[in-house]
Amino acid sequence: MRKGLSLIMICSLLVLGGLWGSPVVHSAEDIAGFSVNFENLKVPAGVSPFVDGSVIMVPVRPVGEALGYEVTYIKEQNSLLMKSDELEYVYRLGGSTVVTSGKGQLALEGKAVLKDNRIYVPLSFFGALGLITSFDASSFEAAVITPQKYADYVVGLLNAGQYEELWQDLFNTELKRLVSISALQSGWESLDGTYGVYVQLNPVTTMQVKGQTVIQATAEFSKGNLSMIITVDNNARLTGLRFTPAAAPAVERELPEGLTEETVVVGEGTAHPLKGILTLPEHSSGRLPSVVLVHGSGSTDHDETAFAYKPFRDIAWGLAQQGIAVLRYDKRSYTYPKEFMGDEAAASFTVKEETVDDAILAAGLLKLDKRLDPGHVYLAGHSLGGMLAPRIDADGGDFAGLILLAGSPRKLWEIVYDQNMNVIDGLDDSNPLKVQTRSAIDGELMKAKALSSLSTEQAKQAPAVFGIPAFYLQEMQQHDTAELARRLAKPVLVMQGADDFQIFAGTDFPLWKEVLKNNPAAEFKQYPGLNHFFVNYDGAGAGTTAEYNVPDIVDPQVITDMGAWINAQYSH
């Protein structure tokens, strides 16, 4: 895969128009134009949407029906019922919540009104249902769009070659400065050589993250698939667009003979219980050493499934074959995505809730198991999990030893900056993206360097840095990985793939040696030819995320070395 693809479709932000300004107040006589799914809404005379103060009011029946809902007024309950094949919403007139499919409730800003025997609801009613809404105060034009139609429209403009229209109509001023029409065109057209002709966009999924709608779908091309992720603000403005290789199915494997697996619960009795899998040798005598596997970044399952890999499955089985019990579990943000990645949580969500607390609970679970030796519980953390391992240990994990798999003692934003610059440096000087994106990345770097000067409240309100919430990064750097690691006197094994382009063998591996130089129990192993997931790959697309899409397993030598190291500590 060309590195140009990785850059424009992963690093570039493609944005629509300006943001909301201060609310504009109008009388109730002002009428707003209205569209549904990019089509003008046709309504009977006298039934148009209107602006009441700073609230846009829309006739619920024609809008709901245009969106494909059956809309019914239940007189006995003074309620509105909106039904589709899959969803049902009930709104009691005069209330401030919408009941979804008889279960959850959605908060609603404003209340319905009756005008000329028609029920009007605030535009925010449809936003609460997960639809995309907008209002242009200068033209008095409002809109409601389903996430599927929005995504289809964006990719449709790209596929039709209407780059200038997309740029003129949908980009905001800042993104027009960063991404030219020619850069947009070259980014989309660069897909053709590797993935072929665009075919269709599959059904989308959505979630709310820090006030924005994140839409994900698989885009099918004639030679392969790509995952498309777009991010939309609260005025239907596109704030992000990226394409990444869609994952092929991971290598299917059966549990090896001589092993057994049990389903357990990490954090049982807490507000966030997590499904876990404990892998054990089927026949053993005496108490066993054990390992907690701690995930990298992102919302991942107990196998740490990423693209076409299942690294935690491979490690768990390989270690259990060496007489070591292994606990792996679903990440909290994987099990409770809306709770931990939604609007309200995003500003205060940190690695403590995402990773640290659950790893400590997992260690406690192993220490209580009578089949296992409580004095020989180890942590093996991959990527972000490796970075956080010293903190998890210090905050209560109290492990017998730590295995750091492709971790780093540096700040997270430093690594993200290097990852982006690595892609930029690989571009031809003639590529217009090179200068434009370098400028954008340098701007993000300036924001990152300013994090330490912000108060907690300022960080919670600050814009994202490299697409990561500012407070998340600030809180993480307040628990300095290098400083915590310097205090370690227990056994530590640092493992690094030489071909890792996410954590750099030439930078991070030597830094670990420097940080741990006073720890005589620290050991270091580097593996030629292995990538970030400790998979050996040298085919097409090597050095880009394309290689992660080729199904494979963790190199057996890595797992053998892990097991030998743990058993050596145990024998002592």
Question: Where are the regions a protein language model picked out?
Answer:
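Accessory cap/linker subdomain of secreted extracellular hydrolases
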Residues: 401-487
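N-terminal cap/lid segment of alpha/beta-hydrolase-fold proteins
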Residues: 247-286
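Short beta-strand/loop motif that positions the catalytic acidic residue
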Residues: 488, 494-496
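Alpha/beta-hydrolase active-site loop
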Residues: 347-369
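Short solvent-exposed beta->alpha transition segments
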Residues: 164-212
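Short beta-strand element of the alpha/beta-hydrolase
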Residues: 286-296
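Primary recognition of N-terminal secretory signal peptides and signal-anchoring hydrophobic helices
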Residues: 4-6, 18-149
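Cap/lid segment of the alpha/beta-hydrolase catalytic domain
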Residues: 294-353, 424, 536-547
